[in-house]
Amino acid sequence: MNNRKVLIAIATIMGVLILPRLSIVAQQSDDEPPEMGFFVSSVSIGDGGNLGGLAGADAHCQSLATAAGSGNRTWAAYLSTQGVGAVNARDRIGSGPWANSAGVIIAASLVYLHYDNSNINWEHALDENGNQFASRIDGDPDFSEHDILTGTQIDGSAFPAGQDQTCNNWTSNDEGSARVGHADRYSFLTPGSPWNSSHGTPGCTQENFVSVGGAGLLYCFATD
């Protein structure tokens, strides 16, 4: 057998040995859960509706994500603003898909995220550490933190100017109101409540939020 035939034979054997290994590596890669791209903030900023504007809310999401090991991504809070230069929450969170901290896909795109298409509910709306928020669903009828600040209509767009839905564009910890969604999709114990636009709060203090089942928590999305 000449040298050329020997080389061909060796290459054939190596191909038989290597290709299955590459296939296994590819399969392992396919089986890896997607990177976290969504979470409910585990804690609030703590100053009622004064989040420091959109920038302050985004920084809060980024800080929590970084502490949880996902600081390599760019994070934004799902919040709208009103009035001149109004911002739509849906326009500031990227295009998806987004997975929670357990690797479950919350929504594949903006279309699937809104209305009743998303996977946002008490089971899957986890915080950045993989924990569930307090809800009446878990057995305590008198305590819930399912109200999540959004200032947003059901389709993810901003409310028109007029009645405050954003605590003065997330700068007020006193007067005004914030539109919230129910992350567990329940109103008391009745299912079907929107995750992003359920009701307004009676004011913008931290105490106002707590009084109606909230804590000033945020939805955080990876934009990249």
Model-derived regions: residue spans:
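Short intrinsically disordered, low-complexity coil segments enriched in acidic
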Residues: L7, I18, L64-A67
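Bacterial N-terminal signal peptides
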Residues: A9-R21
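Bacterial N-terminal signal peptides that target proteins for export
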Residues: M1-I10
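Secreted/extracellular ectodomain signature
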Residues: S23-D224
